């Protein structure tokens, strides 16, 4: 069985840019390569799970998504932090064109992308985590049956502030960024960076 870190992309790994699809707009968040390398060194597989409604809306193509992921991995590999697999949902139930305007099972918070990952990895859910900056990421991870971390990058800090007001924390851990998420997960599982 393999322990997996499932990762949202935009706002978690890279600076949030509406409908990011051009590599010149890709900016990795501080500490991301170091955190990913640390997870790899701990034996985790790294799997990106990302909704890409820009495909459904006709803003860019699936080839654009794959090319951006290839480029992102190129940048990360230079730092010893390569992603093991990327899964994306190109659909949207309301705002889409042609074959992409559907109610699917892959769009977060559904678990279809996690299930796709199970075709490539022998996922040990008890030792795996979902990390993201939105409640939809947290809900997806919970629906799949893994523990979750909300990061304060992207939309995460605002989400966490709202949840504090409500006194409701649907995530297992909160961390300011991905490197802190690594440290928090290690504390939960007995180590520290």
Which role does the model predict for each range below?
Residues 3, 63, 70-84, 93-130, ...:
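Asp-based, Mg2+/Mn2+-dependent phosphohydrolase catalytic module
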Residues 8-10, 14, 51, 133, ...:
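Acidic active-site catalytic centers that drive phospho-/nucleotidyl reactions
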Residues 5-10, 88-89, 151:
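Non-cysteine beta-strand/loop elements that form the S-adenosyl-L-methionine
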Residues 12, 32, 55, 59, ...:
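Gly/Ser/Thr-rich helix-start
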Residues 24-25, 58-63, 101:
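Short, solvent-exposed loop/turn segments at secondary-structure boundaries
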Residues 36-72, 81-95, 141:
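Substrate-recognition element of Asp-dependent hydrolases with the DxDx(T/V) motif
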Residues 16, 58, 184:
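Residues that scaffold the ATP/ADP-binding catalytic core of kinase and kinase-like folds
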Residues 1-47:
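Active-site neighborhood of HAD-like aspartate-dependent phosphohydrolases
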């Amino acid at each position: 069985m393999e322990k997996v870190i499932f990762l949202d992309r935009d706002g978690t790994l890279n600076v949030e840019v509406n409908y990011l699809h051009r590599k010149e707009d890709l900016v990795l968040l501080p500490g991301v390569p170091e955190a990913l390398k640390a997870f790899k060194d701990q034996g985790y597989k790294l799997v990106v799970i990302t909704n890409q409604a820009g495909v459904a809306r006709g803003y860019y193509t699936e080839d654009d998504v794959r090319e951006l992921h290839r480029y992102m991995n190129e940048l990360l590999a230079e730092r010893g932090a390569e992603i093991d697999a990327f899964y994306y949902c190109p659909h949207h139930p309301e705002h889409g064109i042609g074959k992409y305007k559907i109610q699917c099972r892959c769009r977060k918070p559904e678990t279809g992308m996690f299930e796709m990952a199970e075709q490539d990895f022998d996922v040990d859910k008890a030792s795996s985590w979902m990390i993201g900056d939105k409640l939809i990421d947290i809900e997806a991870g919970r629906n799949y049956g893994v523990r979750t971390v909300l990061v304060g990058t992207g939309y995460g800090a605002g989400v966490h502030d709202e949840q504090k007001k409500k006194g409701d924390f649907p995530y297992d851990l909160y961390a300011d960024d991905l490197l802190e998420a690594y440290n928090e997960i290690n504390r939960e599982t007995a180590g520290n960076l």
